From Swiss-Prot:
Its EC number is 3.1.11.6. Heterooligomer composed of large and small subunits. This is Exodeoxyribonuclease 7 large subunit. It comes from Helicobacter pylori (strain ATCC 700392 / 26695). Bidirectionally degrades single-stranded DNA into large acid-insoluble oligonucleotides, which are then degraded further into small acid-soluble oligonucleotides.
Amino acid sequence: MDVLSVSEINAQIKALLEATFLQVRVQGEVSNLTIHKVSGHAYFSLKDSQSVIKCVLFKGNANRLKFALKEGQEVVVFGGISVYVPRGDYQINCFEIEPKDIGSLTLALEQLKEKLRLKGYFDEENKLPKPHFPKRVAVITSQNSAAWADMKKIASKRWPMCELVCINTLMQGEGCVQSVVESIVYADSFHDTKNAFDAIVVARGGGSMEDLYSFNDEKIADALYLAKTFSMSAIGHESDFLLSDLVADLRASTPSNAMEILLPSSDEWLQRLDGFNVKLHRSFKTLLHQKKAHLEHLVASLKRLSFENKHHLNALKLEKLKIALENKTLEFLRFKKTLLEKISTQTLTSPFLQTKTERLNRLENALKLAHANLKLPQFGALVSKNNQAIELEALKRGDKIELSNEKTRASAEILSVDRV
């Protein structure tokens, strides 16, 4: 048996292993994952409960992965055994990697969803509100598609006042993602201008999952999320649920359904307006009746106040005339009394003069009583005792008195007198 050097034996092992294990599929758990920042190569180990084997995924193959390779993942790698002669190491040179039990596209989509969820792409507080009465809507679709024809037909029936603008876009196949992104950005560029769109609708009819999968792309999700214009995703059928549906401000199950959700029904609004008109007429009629009644009440109150004010002024004038008459009468009586006092005592004792004096005193008392009545307030009463006017200060407990005004007389008894 020939003696071999270390290099020779490693070289023979390399030739044997690489020829024997040219293509292998190996299942295991990813561990010790390292991605080289400069080269982009990924180095990791694949292990099960008993063994470990080293693996390498070079940059070119890594870029073709549909999902992100992570520590602890259960995967199936496809590749070939390679031996590094200087160290006698062997490893699997991975050409493809798929997650165990689920497809790589499915895993990639779930990973992307989680990434976007953490960035807030699905949060309701980041969604823009649906416009109530859209005037101008951008539809991102193929201008020759059945979806566009259906959308125009429904829009013309529901809300013909709305202008529907088709932005012709490639909706499947190679170049679809870039075309959709460019159309979204273009439509949104009119934001805050006189030609701004009230809504952007990304729409296409049904198809295979391969046809629709472009709308799970992160670039389309970014374009929808960053748009300042309200957006809708209307891709495929009710059963098709794509990433664009989660990111857009609103999802419609089909392109036709998008028009039914976005555009109000002119027939329904005409019925509503008729109802509003009836309610408005009733409310106005009721309000007019209330205001009319209130006005009539105010007019009546004004007339009553005017009459009372006029009556009060006349009463004041009469009061002034009565006071003037009283003063003149008192002045005359004083003059007569003074004149009589000048007559001698003997003359006063004469029956004739005595009679005249008594009559004069009666007249004076009557005048005082009339004076008290004249000074009676509008809402007051004359106080008298034994048919003689009496001041309040002269009253005492137990006195029987009479209260009177122009319309009423009443009797009363003094229960107590408080001096102020």
